[in-house]
Amino acid sequence: MKYVIILGDGMADEPIPSLNGKTPLQAADTPTFDYMAPRSRMGMLKTVPEGFHPGSEVANMSVLGYDLPTTFEGRGSLEAASIGVDIERGEMAMRCNLICVENGKIKNHSAGHISDEEAAELIAFLSEKLGSDTVRFYPGISYRHLLKIRGGDKRIDCTPPHDVPGTPFREVLVNADVPEAEETADLINDLILKSQVLLANHPVNKKRIAEGKDPANSIWPWSPGYRPSMPTLAERFGIKSGVVISAVDLIRGIGVYAGLKPVAVEGATGLWNTNYEGKAKAAIEAMKNNDFVFVHVEASDEAGHEGDVALKTRTIEYLDQRLCKPIVEAADRMQESVRIAVLPDHPTPCRLKTHTSNPVPFMIYSKGENADGISEYNECSAINGSLGTLETDGFIKELLK
């Protein structure tokens, strides 16, 4: 048996008036999901344990069945693994967004989805001006970068910028949870303020403003953590070989710690215009020689953060017709059985423009296996699935059993 997870980040939503009370998943034209649904077992998955923030790092680790209270160490350390940055003892890693601040308020978490090339130039500039033996910046993709602090204390309260669009940034600066962490909080806040001065008149931002684009005029570090201790899927379930396919450093980093080999796909952007066909082709190729394939698509999440209902619906259709369809067709042709799961990691409702902790719908498809006979796959239908509501490692064990 081979196993494939197709994860549409943030794909789940809530009923939307402009869609006649349907969710984007219900409203989208999804012939592949419609084919899979009556041939699948369904259920709901609680991906955000009590006490955890509904971030993609938490939710994707939950999908893979990790025990969050014992393994979670923040987003930064996971993303570091993806870009080959080692987190040593005594070092703290953080996600470091490039964001847009306008009139003292956070306009968006992505600096208008700044390009990789522009972002790399800005991160190199900040590294030159603000870097030291204590502070290191590392470039990632688009607005997503890495900050490493030697001697940093993770006991700080950091606000994810995508949770607070329109909020005065000074209201959500870093706070220490314990007195011992005040030095770390002060250091990070100082870096934020200094970055704003340095970036205000940088040529990259002057050019972006002239083109009518949002400037990347501030950094925003968040999700601190140390090096995680995560057993691999091979150690936990005997998976002999597997790959992770994603445009997002976070997901590739989770894959690295899970023992999965990252596969790069040209044109994978993390946005609606990602290379769906390229990802499908990479997954089909990986299925030939691997037991486990994890395909992650970010597009629906970004559309949800923008509150763009039409775009989110379209990204679900692209996922269905341009990625799922060729993978399912290839799986059905293989001599060896293939079990395919489709699910989001968390909802990103367009109304809220941020993540929620609500359980997400999943279906597990395999040609010739017992099925629930439910005609559609969405947030409402999956509630009636035979697998009920799962949590912790319930989903991954059900997939791999």
Model segments located where?
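Feature captures the catalytic ectodomains and active-site-proximal regions of enzymes
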Residues: M1-K401
